[in-house]
Regions:
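Aromatic-anchored segments of alpha-helical transmembrane domains
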Residues: 6-11, 78-84, 141-150, 189-197
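Residue-level signature of the transmembrane alpha-helical core
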Residues: 33, 71, 75, 105, ...
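Functionally important transmembrane alpha-helices
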Residues: 159-223
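Residues that define the loop-to-transmembrane-helix transition and helix capping
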Residues: 134-135, 178-181, 232
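N-terminal, membrane-interfacial amphipathic/helix-forming hydrophobic leader that caps
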Residues: 1-55, 195-265
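Function-critical hydrophobic alpha-helical transmembrane segments in multi-pass membrane proteins
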Residues: 93-154, 165, 172
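Helix-loop interface residues and adjacent transmembrane-helix termini in multi-pass membrane transporters
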Residues: 52, 130-131, 153, 176-177, ...
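Interfacial transmembrane-helix boundary/kink motif in multi-pass membrane proteins
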Residues: 1-4, 24-37, 50-83, 96-104, ...
Length: 265
């Protein structure tokens, strides 16, 4: 059943903008929203059929609040990363002004929903149930990092950064809340702020029109700036996300959230 869920979500992961490159941007955003709803529906149906339960990790009552917190946290985290990079002279920043947000919003939303369902909802949750949280965190973080290994501009540093900063931190948010909503919010806001607000590469990809343009200082070391992969493969991103991840794990431990199941009752 886990394999079936994974394959279904992998199909839903294909960005609508790649399938409809010449479509109206607003239509593309709407199609991305539909893809997210389909992914959520597939996950819910297969969990219901395969595990004989309704997925508490997608409980609707806390969704709005946890999504809002996640969106705010993700935006603040990436803004902090760029403040460090720009302040240290590692990136230049040029404001462009108003730009359509449809493409960036669609990409951020779809990748966040589908990847969180697959990596935290399936891989982390089921490994946690089978082998405990330590193995689940290590394996899911490593797989998340390796999943970005073939992106444009990927390096060993980028794989390590994605595994540690996103794999651990997003998993910790799931562990703390027992839901997927906060990790979805952080994931979406991080990518949107990175690509649309600051105009930087997102995991080596182009998010389309942006409010500004951020360019790395070519003379700086790759591990400081992230190279073509983008700022998330930089040391400042690793430190910021690592700090949030450690604090979140500490809060989860204090809340006694490391039991046999990751999902809250």
């Amino acid at each position: 059943m886990a394999v079936l869920i994974g394959l279904s979500l992998r199909v839903a992961m294909v960005p609508v903008q790649q399938l409809l490159p010449k479509a109206d941007p607003v239509l593309g955003l709407a199609a991305s929203g539909v893809a997210c709803l389909i992914a959520l529906g597939i996950y819910t149906l297969l969990v219901r059929l395969g595990e004989d339960r309704w997925p508490g990790e997608l409980a609707l009552k806390p969704a709005a609040g946890q999504l809002a917190i996640g969106l705010g946290l993700g935006s603040a985290m990436f803004a902090a990363v760029m403040a460090i990079l720009i302040g240290a002279g590692l990136y230049s920043f040029e404001w462009h002004g108003a730009a359509p947000a449809w493409r960036g919003a669609g990409l951020a939303m779809q990748s966040a929903v589908v990847e969180e369902l697959l990596v935290r909802g399936v891989i982390l949750r089921l490994l946690w149930r089978a082998f405990g949280p330590a193995v689940a965190f290590a394996a899911s973080a490593a797989l998340f990092g390796l999943g970005h290994a073939f992106n444009p501009g990927a390096t060993v540093m980028s794989v390590v950064c994605i595994a540690l900063e996103a794999g651990i931190m997003l998993g910790a948010l799931y562990a703390l809340t027992g839901r997927l909503w906060m990790s979805i919010g952080v994931h979406a806001a991080w990518n949107f702020t990175q690509g649309y607000v600051f105009g930087a590469a997102v995991s080596g990809g182009d998010f389309g029109p942006s409010l500004a343009r951020s360019v790395a200082n070519g003379d700086a070391s790759l591990w400081l700036i992230g190279g073509e992969f983008g700022p998330e493969a930089s040391l400042p991103a690793l430190l910021v996300c690592g700090a949030v991840g450690v604090v979140t794990l500490w809060l989860a431990v204090r809340a006694r959230r490391f039991g046999k199941e990751a999902t809250a009752e």
